[in-house]
Amino acid sequence: VQGMVYCDTCRSANALGFMR
């Protein structure tokens, strides 16, 4: 499962407040 990549993307999105 792409956990590392997902986490990295989620972190970026979280910074923008996209995924909250």
UniProtKB/Swiss-Prot annotation:
First-listed, main subcellular location of the protein, grouped into a coarse class: secreted
Keywords: Allergen, Secreted
Cystine pairs: none
GO cellular component, one term: extracellular space
Protease recorded as keyword: no
Compartments, record wording: Secreted
PROSITE patterns: OLEEI (PS00925)
UniProt family annotation: Belongs to the Ole e I family.
Misc remark: On the 2D-gel the determined pI of this protein is: 5.3, its MW is: 17 kDa.
Listed name of the protein: Pollen allergen Beta v 1
Gene source species: Beta vulgaris (Sugar beet)
